[in-house]
Amino acid sequence: MESLSLKFIEPYWFKFVDYYGEDFLITYGTFIAHEVFYFGSFIPFFLCDFMPFLQKYKIQPTKKNEWKTQFNCIFKVLMTHIFVQLPMMYIFDPAIKAIGLSARAPLPSIPYLIFTIACCFLIEDFYFYWVHRALHHGFWYKHIHKVHHDHAAPFGMTAEYAHPLETVILGVGTVIGPFLFSRDLFTLWVWLGTRLFQTVECHSGYDFPWNPTKLIPFWGGSHFHDFHHETFVGNYSSTFTYLDKIFGTSDKYYSRKQIRDSKLAAGKSE
């Protein structure tokens, strides 16, 4: 099953690790990778705002985010990355290495890598649902989570626009999966890139019908999460829909969706 192996890139990966050093890559390399993945995911959706033919896919087309609002968001997110996430990575570096994270571990097979990423999504989504739901109560919402809801019509950059404490708390759910299933840096970076693109797309404000994630069972997507920002309630999951369905926290979303779909169907039949 050599075709399902990543052995062909192992020599290049290990040369990369030898050149920069494992210590540098685990902390600072991960931070740089995070910035590249995050801003790299945001830019395509940002450019969509300048393409008139894509505006029909805007979820809240009547709400426009002013340049000042977007710049303020970008600045605050960047400050959070530099002064919260980077120090957090540095502080937890010894613990991460003690647990066994290595940049020189053999690369996983492609099937196991896909399995790991899928498990990471499921674990993070479960953790996120309950913590996010708790953050919508009393003190936690008023003093912490309300920051993330500054934007009722989200755009890509708002994905990590949050109170510093929320950044730390929700960040825990992101790292649980990789340390349970694979403690190699390569897998961590693949998961990080996948998760960051997912959360930026989820906050993008666009719902493209050709998005391949629509083929994934129980996948929420941007339309599902946008409702949460618009109404401030329900749809608490980060990725999937099954927990919201089980616990009835997406009932309002599906009721409104049913009404909207009925109106669209009636309009087409006329």
From Swiss-Prot:
<dbReference type="GO" id="GO:0005789">
    <property type="term" value="C:endoplasmic reticulum membrane"/>
</dbReference>
<keyword id="KW-0472">Membrane</keyword>
<feature type="short sequence motif" description="Histidine box-3">
    <location>
        <begin position="224"/>
        <end position="230"/>
    </location>
</feature>
<keyword id="KW-0444">Lipid biosynthesis</keyword>
<keyword id="KW-0443">Lipid metabolism</keyword>
<keyword id="KW-0560">Oxidoreductase</keyword>
<dbReference type="InterPro" id="IPR050307">
    <property type="entry name" value="Sterol_Desaturase_Related"/>
</dbReference>
<comment type="pathway">
    <text>Steroid biosynthesis; zymosterol biosynthesis; zymosterol from lanosterol: step 3/6.</text>
</comment>
<feature type="short sequence motif" description="Histidine box-1">
    <location>
        <begin position="132"/>
        <end position="136"/>
    </location>
</feature>
<feature type="domain" description="Fatty acid hydroxylase">
    <location>
        <begin position="118"/>
        <end position="249"/>
    </location>
</feature>
<keyword id="KW-0752">Steroid biosynthesis</keyword>
<dbReference type="InterPro" id="IPR006694">
    <property type="entry name" value="Fatty_acid_hydroxylase"/>
</dbReference>
<feature type="transmembrane region" description="Helical">
    <location>
        <begin position="82"/>
        <end position="102"/>
    </location>
</feature>
<feature type="transmembrane region" description="Helical">
    <location>
        <begin position="31"/>
        <end position="51"/>
    </location>
</feature>
<dbReference type="Pfam" id="PF04116">
    <property type="entry name" value="FA_hydroxylase"/>
</dbReference>
<keyword id="KW-0753">Steroid metabolism</keyword>
<keyword id="KW-0756">Sterol biosynthesis</keyword>
<feature type="short sequence motif" description="Histidine box-2">
    <location>
        <begin position="145"/>
        <end position="149"/>
    </location>
</feature>
<protein>
    <recommendedName>
        <fullName>Putative methylsterol monooxygenase DDB_G0269788</fullName>
        <ecNumber>1.14.18.9</ecNumber>
    </recommendedName>
</protein>
<feature type="transmembrane region" description="Helical">
    <location>
        <begin position="110"/>
        <end position="130"/>
    </location>
</feature>
<keyword id="KW-1207">Sterol metabolism</keyword>
<keyword id="KW-1133">Transmembrane helix</keyword>
<keyword id="KW-0812">Transmembrane</keyword>
<comment type="similarity">
    <text>Belongs to the sterol desaturase family.</text>
</comment>
<dbReference type="GO" id="GO:0005506">
    <property type="term" value="F:iron ion binding"/>
</dbReference>
<keyword id="KW-0408">Iron</keyword>
<keyword id="KW-0256">Endoplasmic reticulum</keyword>
<dbReference type="GO" id="GO:0016126">
    <property type="term" value="P:sterol biosynthetic process"/>
</dbReference>
<keyword id="KW-0520">NAD</keyword>
<dbReference type="GO" id="GO:0000254">
    <property type="term" value="F:C-4 methylsterol oxidase activity"/>
</dbReference>
